[in-house]
Each structure stands twice: as structure tokens, then as C-alpha cells.
Amino acid sequence: MTAERLPHVRVLLATYNGVRWLEEQLESTLRQQGVQVSVVASDDSSSDGTVELLQRWGSRDRIQILPPSANRFGSAHRNFLRLIRDAEPGDADFFALADQDDIWLPDKLLRAVECLSASSAQGYSGNVTAFWPDGRVQLIDKAQPQRSLDYLFGSPGPGCTFVLPRSVFLKLKAFITEQFDRLQTIWVHDWLIYAFVRSSGGRWHIDSSPLMLYRQHGLNEIGVNAGWRAAMNRWKLVRSGGYRRDILAIADATGVANTVVDSLRHLNLADRMALILRVRAFRRRFSECLILAVLLMVMPRG
């Protein structure tokens, strides 16, 4: 970057049947203040006019659409993996992830760039304000102090708040390109990216300022992870073995090998007790530590 030009942020946008919300997302993304913005979009075989809307915007604005895939990705995770692998970095200084249905406040990207520069961090995420069709709003606070191994157990917040410096993105791109097939089975791209940065010794900045309106609706793939329904979904994921499989898959992919991973791999009674005794290193909130301690007792070995 030079003093004469604004920092260039390349936004990686994943879409699937989101035409009813996409225009607001694009407007708020391209109207960011204090930065240059370009968008690379990957669509997962939409049938509702999403691609046509992207093409209309792309003909007049700073949007590139990646060629359609022969087969459906089937999840936002796989779509984002494809975006990171296939998007050309160009001359961008920073890279951000975007969903198709949110509204970004005008200084979202500038704030991320300033936080990364001031903290010398290798990754950025932030709080969001969730909103529902009935008018409800709720702050989603993820800005608790980080723990030494929290990256093994979950994401620092919604992936649509993530911003990475160019040097980190290029390393992530090489990592995903090399392990692309292996990473398909992991469910959540934001958790994987966080683990990639933190496991290699990188610093991560979680911003307490909510600079995005996080739309909630019936078609959210992830959405706000709160309430009894979310608790039931987490319980099912743990009892099915899916949560443990993701932890181990992310640890294996990022090269994390320690006593925690060994205990999770074997998970006999002594391993469970050892993990519970260290649970404060695994989650940022005390309440989440208590929940994880219970889940570690019922987590299946298979």
C-alpha cells in the first residue's frame, strides 16, 4: 500500500438462491468507505435469478463471477473453499468473506483494515447485530478474551466478518489448494480458517464493535447459534460424532498434534477427565466451558 491509494479489499462472495437479499448485500459491500472494493462471486447452481442479478451488477461494477461448477457444492463451506482456491488475488491488500444476505455498515472494511494494522494481527473478525423479519435485533457478542486452544473447538464468530491480510490469504490459498479434497468433509469454513491462522502462531483480533447487520431467516445455513433449537442441533451433532470428527479433521489438516488431540482421538474415561480439567483453555465464555465439559462426557468414541 502507498499513501496515495486506498487499501484494496477483495471480497469473496458465496451465493445460493439468495436473490431476494443479494442486492442489499452488494450495495452495502460496494459502498464501503475508505477502501477500494472488488468482489469475486461463486454461485452454487442457483435457480432463482441470483446468477442473473450478479451478471447485471458485474456488467457495471467491480464484480467477477467464477465459472459455474459442474456439480453442486452443497454447502457454504465448500463454496468458500472453491472461492479461496480459485479467486485471483490481483493487487488486493486484504481479503474478506461475504454471505449473500447481510447488510454491511459503511465503515466495516475500513475498521477491519485499521484493526489489523494497529494490532499486527493475522486475522480479523467481529461482533454482529442479528436482525429478524419481525423487527427483533440482538447483539451477537463474540469478543471474549481468546484462549490458548479455543481454535480447536470452534470459530471466533461469523465467517462473514473475517478479513485477512494478503500474506496470510496467500498462505491459506496454498493450504486449501493442496488439501482441497481432504477438506471437503469439514462442515464450517470459518472455524477452519481460524484454526489455520492460530495453529501456526498467528494472532487474531476479535472486534467488539458490531459493523454488520446479520440477517436471520428460515434459509440460513448457520445463523445465530442460540436458543433451544440451536442447543438441540449442537447436541445432535455431538451425539452423532460429527463435532469430534470435525475437531480431529481440523487438527489433522492444520498439523496440530498435542495431548488434547490425542485425548480426543482415544477418548477413554481418563482422557475425558483430562480434557474436562483443561476445558478453560478450549472456550472463551465460562458458560461454554461448562457446556463443553458435559458434552465431553457424552461424546461418542466412534
Residue spans for each PLM region:
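C-terminal subregions of glycosyltransferases and related glycan-biosynthesis enzymes
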Residues: 175-182, 187, 191-192, 198-199, ...
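Nucleotide-sugar donor-binding/catalytic module of glycosyltransferases
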Residues: 2-228
